[in-house]
Structure formats: structure tokens, C-alpha cells
Amino acid sequence: MTKKLHIKTWGCQMNEYDSSKMADLLDATHGYQLTEVAEEADVLLLNTCSIREKAQEKVFHQLGRWKLLKEKNPDLIIGVGGCVASQEGDHIRQRAHYVDIIFGPQTLHRLPEMINAVRGNRSPVVDISFPEIEKFDRLPEPRADGPTAFVSIMEGCNKYCTYCVVPYTRGEEVSRPCDDILFEIAQLAAQGVREVNLLGQNVNAWRGENYDGTTGSFADLLRLVAAIDGIDRIRFTTSHPIEFTDDIIEVYRDTPELVSFLHLPVQSGSDRVLNLMGRTHTALEYKAIIRKLREARPDIQISSDFIVGFPGETTDDFEKTMKLIADVNFDMSYSFIFSARPGTPAADMVDDVPEEDKKQRLYILQERINQQAMAWSRRMLGTVQRILVEGTSRKSLMELSGRTENNRVVNFEGTPDMVGKFVDVEIVDVYTNSLRGKIVRTEAEMGLRIAESPESVIARTRKENDLGVGIYQP
């Protein structure tokens, strides 16, 4: 009988990536098949996020629902991972004693051993340590799921912004070796992946070891990834302005595979608030980066993160944020009302901004960003955009759907053989959440760059005597 695994994931793209790796790992070692139905699973895993308000209570509410399933099936294994587990592991065990496994973001690769231990002696396992890069060395060969894929290139953060729990839950910055990253991407390219999104809590801080023992820069890595045949679109997230150096900007000038879209969080337009946040950059320095980016890539569009109502934020501070939004002309944003994360310096600050002011500021900010996003979309009307075709449209099975470089969804009439390939379309209609296009060119007519085949990258980066991401043996 097939054993089944159910994973519920909250939070960032890194958590989504981690969950996909958990599924692949437990399929390879134990034969667990994913199911969307928790009631039919043999193992339930909750991959948590501690960024949002009341994250801990959300975890216990979910575990309470799963407790009912365990009462019906005592052999059911329940595991909690992610950042809340890393931060609150002991508390979870005390409050939810029926949880069998608690693991952190850096120990998910040990899940097979943890499950074996629970199956063997029914004693709970807690492992929320930070074993640096070992996690990546023991994951199975990646499996493509469509033409796009996420690839984690580093973990952790050293910036210690006063509101953020990431350094405490994922540890300090650790970069994967260059060859390991190229090996994984080449494997994905050989399976038909055309777009990769490089992931890290502070992705542009990557400083990985090269094959010759030297240390590579993030700009170097971008060019190496772009050289892999089949990888014709590269994204990365999330970046920090303090390490967005000129050599990265130069990649935008000479590497067409790097998309004309960047998510670069700024959080506030007020230098005083930025200082309280521990951001180590000013609004003017942020704008200088954007100016240089637009000199290198005039059509680049920018998105960002904003926190409103940070302790001490005045009306004048908020107005400076709104001015920055207008000056940069952001295309989109992820914006939130401040809520204190336990254990962070900001949690000890006086939360002196009235709740109504916070809500009003968030509304004003989001309305302005939405207006700017629609203006950007309208500018695309009549232009030709390159689309990576992801599949059929959600609105009509008779149409295809894909995304532009700036993440706009485009629906258009096409043929099934276009899925997983690029097409150029003319934008003929603009809607609130999507665009409509008409095909003007297929991939065969594009003359995309060919530099190095995935097979040659795999052969060049494979290490027979090392563990490596591709040869984990359960």
C-alpha cells in the first residue's frame, strides 16, 4: 500500500523550496507520495513561517486540527518545521506533546532518520541545530515541475534588522559552492526548465567557493548560470541594498537572460526609521542603486517591501516613504503593518503608532502602488513581450498562459506544443490582474543564445567521491 505524505507550507519562497525538497527526499528514501488530503496521510508536516503576526498561535491552531487525526490514527507522524519550529521548538513540545518531530530549516535533510527513529521507538525527535551547508549535500536529485524552478543558493542572514527573526531562525549566511549550484541547475535544464529563480534570505550576499578554491561573487554566478543552454530567464530574490554592488548592476547591462525586473526591499523612505530598523542604508543610497540600474537596463521595473507603523514612525516619516514610492515609481510591493516578532530588538521598542493610523497608512500606500502598477501595465499595451508559456489559462482551457519578465500574466491563443517554450506576443488588452496577447513570434524564430549544454555542465561539476546533491543514498 502506498504511503502518503501531506505538507502544509506557510511563508516565503524559500519555505516553498524547502517543502518541495522534503517531498522529493521522503519519496526517495521511504516512497512517500504527496497528497493534498491530510486525512489520508501517514506523515503530516507543517512548514512554518514566523514573519507574520500571531505566527505561533496559527501553528497551534493547525496542530489542534491534526491532533484529532492522530487520536483516530495513533501511528500518524506529525512534524513541525520551519522558522517557528526553530524559534519555539521546546515550547511546541510542551504545549503539543503529540507532535513527534520538530526540525529547523537547516535540518530538514535529516527527516528520513527522524522518521525512522519515531517509527522505531515512538520517542519524539527535536533537531533545530544549524549544521551549515550539510543540508544541501544530502538532498536528492532535483525534479522539474514545469518550465520554472527555484534553486536555493544560500541560507541565513547576517544583517540583523531590528524587526526580523531570520538570523535567529535560519542562522547566519552560508553560501553553497558554485559547482553544486550549477550542477543542480544543469539537471533542471536537462529536464526542460527554462527559468530559474535563485533563492536566499540575502541572495546577493552569496560568496560561494569555486572549483579552484577561490571565492566567487554573485555577479560571477549570474553569468555562469546564464551560460547554461536552455536557461534563458534568470530571477533572484531576496536582495539587500547594502550589497547590491556595481558588478551586479553590470550583469544587467550585458546578460539578457537576467530579467528586467528586480525585487529590492527598502522598508521605509525615512532615514530616521531606516536607522531604527537597522537597515544600514539611506533612502538616497537606495535611489542611487535604482538610478544606476536604469542606466544599465532602462526598462527595468522594481518591486519592494514596506513596513508601515514601525515604532516611532511619524506622519512626516510616512510622507517620506510615499515620496520614495513616487520617485522610484515602484511596479508592485509587499507591504505590511508592523507587528513585533518575539526575541527581536524591535519587540522591546514602544509601539506608539495608533492602530488606525497604521491601517490608514497601509491603505494609502497600497492604493498608490496599485495605481502605479496599472500605469505600468497600460504602458505595455501595443508592445511586444516575451512570454514563457507555463500551461493552459485558468480562465479558458482553449487558451495558453505565461508570464512576462515583469511577472505579468498574459493569456493568448496558441497550440499545446508551445508549453514550456518562449513566444513573443503583442499586448492587445490590459486588465487588473492580467494582460491579453496575440502571438507574433515563436521560439524557433528567436535565435536564443547557446553557450554550454546542461550535459557538459553536469559532467564538469559532478564529483564522484563527494556526496553531492545528486547522489544521496538513503
From Swiss-Prot:
Top enzyme class: transferase
Iron among keywords: yes
MTTase N-terminal domain mapped to chain residues: 3-120
Binding-site residues, [4Fe-4S] cluster 1: C12, C49, C83
Xref: InterPro entries: Elp3/MiaA/NifB-like_rSAM, Methylthiotransferase, Methylthiotransferase_CS, Methylthiotransferase_N, Methylthiotransferase_N_sf, MiaB_methiolase, rSAM, rSAM_horseshoe
SUPFAM superfamilies listed in its UniProt record: Radical SAM enzymes
PROSITE patterns: MTTASE_N, MTTASE_RADICAL, RADICAL_SAM, TRAM
Cofactor note: Binds 2 [4Fe-4S] clusters. One cluster is coordinated with 3 cysteines and an exchangeable S-adenosyl-L-methionine.
Matching Pfam families: Radical_SAM, TRAM, UPF0004
Gene Ontology CC: cytosol
Domain TRAM, residue spans: 378-441
Example GO molecular function: metal ion binding
Domain called Radical SAM core: residue spans: 143-375
Entry keyword Iron: yes
Record: residues binding [4Fe-4S] cluster 2: C157, C161, C164
Subunit organization: Monomer.
Function: Catalyzes the methylthiolation of N6-(dimethylallyl)adenosine (i(6)A), leading to the formation of 2-methylthio-N6-(dimethylallyl)adenosine (ms(2)i(6)A) at position 37 in tRNAs that read codons beginning with uridine.
Protein name (database record): tRNA-2-methylthio-N(6)-dimethylallyladenosine synthase
Organism: Klebsiella pneumoniae (strain 342)
Gene: miaB
